[in-house]
Every structure is written in C-alpha cells, then in structure tokens.
Regions:
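Alpha-helix/helix-capping structural signal
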Residues: 31, 104, 169-170
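Short aromatic/basic micro-patch
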Residues: 4, 27, 100
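Conserved AMP-binding/adenylation subdomain of ANL enzymes
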Residues: 34-51, 58-147, 160
Length: 172
C-alpha cells in the first residue's frame, strides 16, 4: 500500500548545536531532504557498490542526510566507526570508497598524512618542505617518490577511497 507523504510537513527532527553551541531542534521536510540529496547527486556519482564509513553522530544533520539517507537511497553500504578514536582503524578495516566528513576531520587527517610524509621522505628532499607548501613540495618530488607516497596514503585510507564529500562548515 502506497502512503502519501506531504513534501512540506516535518519528516525528521534532528538536534544540533549549529554554530551557536546551544542545542536546538531542526525540523526537516521531505523537500529539504530531497533537495539536499538531489543537489549532491548532481555533482557526484554514488553507486550501489560504494561503501561509506559513518563517522559523525546520526543526529548531525549532515550525517543524517548525506551519509545515511543519500547512501541508503542508492543502495550503498554504510559501516559505522566504533568511536572517533578508532576512525583510522575503522577506515583500514572497512575500506570505504566514500568518506563524508566535516572540514575539522579532514584537517586532522591532512595534518596526520602530511606529518607522516615529511618524516618518511628521503633526507635529500626534506628541505623542500621548509621552502614550499606541502602540495608544491609533492609536485617537485620525483615521480617514483610521488607514486610511493600516493600508494601509502591510499593504503592508509583503506585502499579504495575514490570520493570525499566535505561539508557542514567552511573549508579553508
């Protein structure tokens, strides 16, 4: 039996601290959810074979709409992080193809990767990190070293990440 769903009525009530830090309820309608999903799908291709790792709490608006409802709408697999402290372990364990993250998490991952690359880079190239940005330095390294770095970074992300979806805050 088909059930009529009003596109403008509240569909889900999510609690968030938003930008003020004080908890409040956010009412999302069917239209709100569908607009978010359709807009995202206009930019990225989510496949049934995709696996994602849910890192943020499900009551987080961004997590609920993009990493839960969107992925379920495409028939994708959702895995769940044991805790924020175990995200790195869970990424290698579940080998996600898509990571839906907030900028703070991406910055944390970036910092960890950059530090590891700097520490393990051959001595003769370490001075480049002092002179150039991380991206510029990587571009100046020999192709074989760039490939080795890329392979290790990909492996640290479970070996299958093809897409990061970043949102819910400014990315600088």
């Amino acid at each position: 039996q088909q059930i009529e769903i009003s596109k403008d009525e509240m569909n889900v009530l999510i609690f968030t601290s938003g930008t003020t830090g004080s908890a409040k309820g956010v009412c999302l309608s069917q239209n709100n959810l569908l607009a978010d999903i359709q807009y995202t799908l206009s930019m990225v291709n989510i496949k049934k074979s995709d696996v994602t790792l849910s890192i943020l709490p499900l009551h987080h608006t961004y997590e609920c709409t993009l990493n839960c409802i969107l992925m379920l709408s495409r028939g994708s697999c959702i895995t769940y992080a044991d805790s924020l402290l175990k995200v790195t372990k869970n990424i290698t364990e579940y080998s996600p193809s898509i990571l839906v993250v907030v900028p703070a998490l991406l910055k944390m991952m970036d910092k960890k990767i950059c530090q590891s690359v700097k520490e393990k880079c051959p001595v003769k190239y370490k001075h480049l990190f002092e002179k150039y940005t991380f991206a510029e330095t990587i571009g100046k390294l020999p192709k074989l070293i760039r490939w080795a770095i890329s392979s290790k970074v990909q492996a640290s992300l479970g070996g299958k990440v093809r897409l990061f979806i970043v949102g819910a805050a400014d990315l600088d």
